[in-house]
């Protein structure tokens, strides 16, 4: 189904559902729609050349006259005249305006508004009349009438006729050129035989004249170059003489004045790197050094981590605790810690392990009355040092005692539960 045509489903129809055109139906020939045909053009021309209604135009002109009469009446009222005098004068003014309009002295068409269709048509007609008068066309002329009389065959024939005289003119010019060339060739052939001997002599003379001219030109150029060099040398000599005179006239005190001026000049700052500044920078770097790998220290400050970098403002706004860390004592302690060798670390690790083992080796006996008394009186336990054999025996006994204590704890719990039940009864 396509655009509402055909079956919704091909099921049960015995077909594939393909919609095929009815080839037995005869299609009527479609008429071509002629846009901007002759009828349309005539209608458009009629609308453009439509003349305004003169009755409506006269009515609008009279309205403009009444507007002028009302304005005149308002002026008389402002002056304070009577109603009878005002009516009489306004009536006379109206009659004069109507007479001028009929005679053509008064033109009110310019005052009419262009919003009205008749006023616009009137203005368009006036413009067309001006154009017709400028081109010298009569009032009976219809635009396009001259082309309607011409046929296509006439147009083609006129064009061909205009091209024929041009072709004839071209052929005539070509013939005249050919004749002129032939006459030239004949003259050259006749004169060549007579002037062959004279031409050889003239050619040799021409070569001599050319060589003489070149030699003269070279000599003139060399003379000009020598003159310029002499002028430059004279100028140099004059300048040297003037400089010698100035040196002789100058007093000997000028050297002293120059020395005094040099002394008065302010000493310029030496912008080169001083040794003191470099020492200060090295001291700062030593202070900033932190426990890091040497690879991290060798890197440039841009490649280091963010924690490694710290701007100057943050350094200035640090708390006093940070200043304590910067103290030389703390710095030495850090260096000792991180510069210690592996043997010291191992020794400290073994010592810590031994201390832990000794703490575990303290005798763990079951609580008794004496221990309760010690706990109440806050007396510290006594540490007993034993040999390796005694330590193994004590471990075995502690394991046995722990198993026995667990059994005794279970029995004591059962007895305590039975006692509590009897008490409750």
UniProtKB/Swiss-Prot annotation:
Pfam families: cwf21
Name the UniProt record assigns to this protein: SRRM2 protein homolog rsr-2
SMART domains: cwf21
Keyword Cell wall biogenesis/degradation: no
Tissue: Expressed in the proximal germline, but not in the most distal part where mitosis takes place. May be expressed ubiquitously in somatic cells.
Region Disordered, residue ranges: 109-131, 161-425
Compartments, as annotated in UniProt: Nucleus; Chromosome; Nucleus, Nuclear body
Key words, A-Z: Chromosome, mRNA processing, mRNA splicing, Nucleus, Spliceosome, Transcription, Transcription regulation
Domain named CWF21: residues: 57-100
Gene Ontology annotations for the cellular component aspect, listed alphabetically: chromatin; nuclear speck; spliceosomal complex
